């Protein structure tokens, strides 16, 4: 799992940096790679802990009751919790990086630098949902590890609300969808956070929403790509009035917006309703309220995007006049994805999870009506503000000027990370380590090299080519060896010494005799210079 987990990260790095000639694309790919690698460090440590104490990494083995009880019984004294929640939190760290949970979300909006089909691939069905799927695969572990599931619930709830608020103020069509993805991933994590053995509906709801979200989010990204192909800009402030120019894109995009807004009978209604029901029935009333609020915000910012793009008045007449529907190869994919965006909610998803034991036999109309009501409120508010030209958006921005500016700049999270990196990590951590590396580590290595070089030069000076000198060195070596033998007094060393000395003496006697008989030339001084 870990190997292919890392290969997913490498693939996203290559896809995001597809336009390698663009500095922004290169920076975005490196940012995604570094952030996810940092998160994967926790994942790796968690895997090592499980491998050492559980004696295996097979999902069936780790999720078994015997293994869970064994890990839960091992205490970690310096942390104050058992090994099971510690390993689960570390694994969730990797999942949070891959699924862009706060505060490791900063790479995902910049991933928009890749081609739009790549964005659809990454944001809809592959990379970003891998973290959610990993937590779901380890549901038995998290269900027992209460500290870990509390972390999952807190992070998921905050991310869902945090990203939805930011999406309200963005004008780049792909960035709105990126923050929408963040919010929906938080929704899925929230569902897993409220799940337990007593109330397992959240587990099913999370996987159900993961499936439906893959359909309508891929449709949204490909629809955005069709719009960008027509008007050659990502800025929604330069769009408007495209419903007549892009009829197929318009209809399919509207279907996707209705699905993600949770309007019945589209797919998103059923999966969102399941998440709300899971939070409500499990007794997590604050996450339920936040999820309900996020449902309204989602409907608002998605129809804000829809009305600014396809209705209102054209902002750039030249671009509007030249806009045309995308070719068949592009709109065909939109039509295909529109079908599951409508019908995927009717799939009896419980049959694929626990053989029907998690099914419910009816709809809680209080929860369903609440979800529909907040969704319609969001749509109506977006209609009033963006369907026709008016000054409501500017008045809203002026009324909430300070807060609006903070939200528009994404709460300055990137700037905070940049400040921490440059002014704290580089200055107070990297600089001292750099000095230690250059002056201590490199200094020790340079000193060793110089000492070795000087020793070599000294030994080279002893090679004179005169047999008398060699004979003196042999005698000195014999005396030194005898002293060592005298101190150690070992039979084996005596034997080795006698054999070695005999060989040395035989060699020098042979060389001496050869020199006397002039059968060989005297040894010449070796000049290695």
Regions found by a protein language model. Give the residues of each.
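Aromatic-capped, Gly/Pro-kinked transmembrane alpha-helices
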Residues: 350-366, 384-529
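Hard-cation-handling environments
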Residues: 323-381
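Short phosphate-coordinating micro-motif centered on Lys-Gly-acidic
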Residues: 6
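Hydrophobic H-region at the start of alpha-helical membrane spans
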Residues: 38-40, 154, 335, 368-376, ...
